[in-house]
Amino acid sequence: MRDGFKVIDADRHVLEPSDWFEKYLPARFRGRVKVEGPNQSRRSIDGQPISDADKMRDTSKQEDFGFTFAASKRWRETFADALAVKFEPASNVRDMDREGVDVSVLFPTLGLHIMWRDDLDPELSAAICRAYNTWLADYCSYDPKRLHGVCLIPLQDPARAVEELRYASEKLGHVGIFWRPNKLCGRTLSSPNYFPIYEAAADIGVTVCVHEGARTVLQQAGSDRYSEFGRHIACHPLEQRLACLNFCADGVLEKFPKLKVAYLESGCGWVPFWLERMDEHWEHEGHGQAKTTKEKPSYYFKRQCWASCEAGEDLAPVFIEHVGADYLTIATDYPHSDCIGKFPDRTVGDLTRNDHLSTEARRKILWDKPARLYQLEV
């Protein structure tokens, strides 16, 4: 609790240990997935780098820890206590207490990239997802009332993906699906190949959590024209707009009215503009193109979607005015770079102390809406 508000962090991250492959991946696959070198600095699958960062990384740097942001001295100083114990579950809960976070929904770090490539063997992808999901369930078991996981599913094979989704949610208790907005195997998020997954997710009640991550080996907005700095600025909000178009304007949410979708780690300022633009095109019949949905895209967003904001996001009031607090959640991004300079006092405190927002709006963003989004019994 922070300043009298209960808090659910809708987008928090784990840092996977280097040995989870050895402990959780079946023996016949272990030689194909490698995390080697000083501090996890060389990572590959079937000899191919897991991410663009793995292609560029200077493996002579002992401080790298296998993640680009971890090379920052400021990051290492900010999270020194958790780093000393390799971000074990107890350290995450202790840091939640420092921030005033009551409940967290956990996303991957290495898993942002590990099975996201077009040429990945579907059987290996399924094994990696099962290994990660099992490890994450064990991680959350440290405090199952406060820690909740978001699963990986092998999207290279939609049938296997449905099977893993049901296992991860019904057997392991995970509350969402991590899903990048980028094209995978030539498919966008409105591809009919994914419809069985959406049907299963809607039936089970788990949320599709659209979450970008820079430095993927997949094609992403900005990767063909910007350096790492510009690419990170561009890819999150631009890819989320395209994902939102897929779901709201391309008929997916109309076809699956019980499906829930969250757009995370891209801020919320893009949403009012994008809904207005999609609605305008819909009202004018797509500038000569046939309408793809019966209702305006914003109708489906407000029926089935949520976005997230950082605690001090200046455009949150604009979102609330034009879209509504009912569609917004709080996300700290702990322990990634978005919360450096804010942890621990401001990652949540900048919102709980924001008197420009009503008490009701803050309560919705901090607790009521993320609880509904993830169907948390809290």
Go through the PLM ranges and name each one.
Residues E123-Y139:
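Active-site-proximal gating segment of KS-fold condensing enzymes and close homologs
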Residues W75-A84, R94-D118, R146-P154, V175-W179:
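Divalent metal-dependent hydrolysis catalytic cores, especially in the metallo-beta-lactamase
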Residues H13, T109, N182, G213-A214, ...:
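Flexible loop residues that form catalytic
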Residues R2-I8, E16-W75, F79-V103, T134-Y142, ...:
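Mid-to-C-terminal alpha-helical segments outside catalytic/metal-binding sites
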Residues F5-R12, E88, I153-Q156, R160:
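Alpha-helical scaffold segments that form or flank carboxylate-/histidine-based iron centers
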Residues A127, C140-H148, I153, P158-T329:
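Catalytic pocket-lining loop regions of alpha/beta-barrel enzymes
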Residues D19-E22, R117-D118, Q220-S223, F273-R277, ...:
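Short aromatic-enriched loop/helix-cap "lid" or pocket-rim segments at secondary-structure transitions
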Residues D119-D121, S223-I233, P344-D350:
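Short glycine/proline- and charge-enriched loop/turn segments
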